[in-house]
Swiss-Prot record:
Annotated function: Transports viral genome to neighboring plant cells directly through plasmosdesmata, without any budding. The movement protein allows efficient cell to cell propagation, by bypassing the host cell wall barrier. Might act by forming tubules structures that increase the size exclusion limit (SEL) of plasmodesmata, thereby allowing viral ribonucleoproteins to spread directly to neighboring cells. Binds to ssRNA.
Renumbered residue ranges of the record's region Disordered: 230-260
InterPro entries for the chain: MPV (IPR000603)
Keyword Transport in record: yes
Family annotation (Pfam families): 3A
GO MF term (any one): RNA binding
Record bears the keyword Transport: yes
Keywords: RNA-binding, Transport, Viral movement protein
Gene Ontology biological process terms in this record: transport of virus in host, cell to cell
Lineage summary: Viruses, Riboviria, Orthornavirae, Kitrinoviricota, Tolucaviricetes
Protein name (Swiss-Prot/TrEMBL): Movement protein
Length: 260
């Protein structure tokens, strides 16, 4: 006996699969598979991939369908991609640990290995692979069971109210009547290559525009007879006393009106 499977790789496909059983507006608010922000403003931060109220709504909808009547649908995540971005300088202390958690597990235990790395090592790209699906009808501690991303800041302390780092979580769900269970694939991590900000003083035109926007030289002598910077040597070399090259703005020559 075959059973009908309601799958959803994206929110649009889920709406199509359940058309007639639920209004579009009911599932437009589920935020399935969207970019989920995660602020590291506390030492330990827990971000459910499916908020409890949303999960209860989806489970209630899927319980109306015969294949998912007893489970409320089985949620499977093929992968969870996380982008880590620090908000501190490169010499800031501390480490960060990130892992995926199943709320059925006690003490925020991880599903598979955790990833640990220095806070000051620049942005990173991570991927986690939950190897099994969970019933949306399940409850854990009177709350709907869910997968979550957990982060912990180690070996450092910062002033309260700020975020030393952020995570951006990307995932796409599959909700169906069939269960998934695979061998554990360890998480992966790659550093994101960074470059320097463009030199703001690299061109003469940009230096002139910055100076003109903040300093007036309308009372200066002409460019042919500028004021000495620090002795004749510095003036001739075009350098300040510190050895830094300087720029003397051009003075506008006075206009002479011709006699008529």
């Amino acid at each position: 006996m075959s059973s009908q499977v309601a799958k959803a790789a994206t929110q649009g496909e889920l709406l199509e699969a359940l058309y007639g059983e639920v209004t579009v507006q009911e599932l437009q608010e589920t935020n399935l598979g969207v970019l989920t922000p995660h602020r590291g403003d506390q030492r330990v931060v827990f971000t459910p991939l499916l908020p409890p109220r949303t999960q209860t709504r989806i489970s209630g909808v899927l319980r109306r369908l015969r294949p998912t009547r007893n489970t409320g649908g089985l949620l499977y995540l093929e992968k969870v991609v996380v982008v880590f971005t620090p908000h501190v300088p490169d010499d800031a202390p501390g480490e960060v640990e990130v892992w995926i958690h199943d709320s059925l597990l006690p003490n925020l235990n991880s599903v598979g290995p955790r990833l640990r790395f220095p806070l000051n090592g620049g942005p990173r790209l991570m991927a986690f692979y939950p190897p099994y699906s969970i019933p949306l009808m399940d409850k854990s501690k009177e709350m709907p069971r869910c997968f979550a991303i957990v982060s912990e800041l180690l070996s450092a302390s910062y002033v309260g109210g700020g975020s030393p780092f952020s995570l951006h979580i990307m995932w796409q769900p599959q909700v169906e009547s069939l269960a998934h269970n695979y061998l554990m694939r360890p998480p992966r991590m790659q550093k994101i290559c960074r470059g320097m900000v463009k030199d703001a003083l690299g061109s003469l035109s940009s230096r002139k525009s910055y100076i003109a926007g903040a300093v007036s030289h309308r009372f200066a002598l002409t460019a042919a007879n500028p004021l000495p910077i620090s002795g004749d040597t510095a003036e001739e070399a075009g350098e300040a006393s510190s050895g830094e090259p300087h720029w003397v703005p051009e003075a506008t020559a006075p206009r002479v009106r011709k006699a008529t």
